[in-house]
């Protein structure tokens, strides 16, 4: 989804468009937008009973302008994709550079497959998502209804595979020095202060003398678990050929975990990791061929799309 935004609107250096306060403290902004959207949805439903399609379209446009106003006030006006900016910087060799360019052209230069390589032989444009959703058949392509943020953008799809396939791809990428984006349910059996993610972190069964035995599929079906947060895998500890624990880079500042890094047990990965973004060269043809399928469309409220809304 971020790739669609970059392709349409471009990029600017962070120094020229730094984060506003609300970008790092977004709870109030998200709550306000959600409240406004719910109010607008009720109004549109009421208007649909007696108004024409043209009237509804006009009302919807006005509502979207108000949402845009809220975002602009709280985050600042976004850079125009076609307006040139000036950027001065020093490269790693202390050589001075000056650039005058539009955000779209800047993004196009950075998006050149010859220029953007996170590792030798890895094209960031070819990366795709693997998911582990045991509710649905493996080796099938999945998507979520209305999951997309840009008209005519690249569709958001997932290749559903067993966890061993995901782990093997992640290990191979890490060994090549490539960090791995992943989506998980961070709220279960994790502690942000210590930076530990482990299914054995809390022994609720011992403490309360109860049994907690839902499977991963059952947790998804009941809403007990869903993708809520994205992080990055940067290292893995392997014993006797099997992963034992993973190093995770989080985005909650250096105050969380060990200077922003967490340790995730392999058991936690089995139960609460749902998505990874991988290079096709690290999976089999059987997996990449799934991308040619017509996707199974999951409903709008499905947990597999939760972290992307």
Where are the regions that the model predicts?
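Extracytoplasmic mature domains of secreted/periplasmic and thylakoid-lumen proteins
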Residues: 1-40
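Residues that flank catalytic or metal-binding motifs in active/ligand-binding sites
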Residues: 2, 178, 227-229, 244, ...
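Structural recognition of the beta-strand scaffold that forms the well-ordered cores
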Residues: 4, 13-15, 180-183, 232, ...
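Solvent-exposed loop/turn segments at secondary-structure junctions
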Residues: 13, 22, 187-189, 253-254
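Aromatic-residue-lined binding/catalytic grooves and analogous aromatic/hydrophobic interfacial grooves
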Residues: 38-147
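Long, positively charged binding patches that form subdomain-scale interaction surfaces
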Residues: 153-228
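Conserved catalytic-core surface of thiol
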Residues: 234, 239, 244-309
């Amino acid at each position: 989804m971020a790739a669609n935004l970059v392709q349409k609107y471009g990029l600017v250096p962070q120094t020229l468009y730094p984060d506003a306060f609300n970008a790092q403290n977004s709870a109030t902004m998200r709550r306000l937008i959600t409240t406004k959207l719910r109010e607008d949805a009720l109004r549109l439903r009421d208007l649909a009973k007696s108004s024409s399609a043209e009237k509804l379209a006009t009302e919807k446009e006005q509502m979207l302008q108000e949402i845009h106003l809220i975002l602009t006030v709280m985050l600042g006006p976004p850079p125009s994709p076609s307006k040139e900016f000036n950027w001065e910087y020093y490269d790693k060799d202390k050589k001075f550079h000056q650039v005058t360019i539009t955000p779209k052209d800047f993004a196009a230069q950075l998006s050149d497959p010859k220029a953007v390589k996170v590792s030798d032989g890895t094209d960031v444009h070819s990366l795709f998502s693997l998911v582990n959703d045991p509710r649905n058949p493996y080796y099938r392509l999945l998507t979520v209804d209305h999951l997309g943020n840009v008209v005519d953008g690249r569709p958001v799809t997932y290749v559903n595979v067993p966890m061993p396939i995901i782990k093997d791809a992640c290990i191979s990428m890490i060994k090549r020095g490539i960090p791995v984006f992943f989506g998980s349910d961070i709220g279960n059996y994790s502690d942000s202060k210590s930076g530990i993610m482990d299914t054995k972190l809390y022994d609720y069964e011992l403490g309360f003398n109860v049994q907690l035995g839902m499977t991963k599929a059952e947790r998804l079906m009941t809403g007990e678990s869903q993708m809520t947060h994205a992080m990055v895998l940067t290292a893995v500890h392997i014993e006797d050929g099997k992963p034992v624990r993973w190093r995770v880079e989080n985005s909650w500042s250096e105050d969380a975990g060990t200077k922003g890094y967490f340790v995730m047990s392999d058991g936690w990965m089995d139960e609460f990791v749902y998505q990874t973004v991988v290079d096709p060269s690290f999976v089999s043809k059987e997996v990449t061929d799934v991308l040619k399928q017509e996707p199974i469309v999951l409903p709008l409220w499905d947990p597999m799309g939760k972290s992307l809304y």
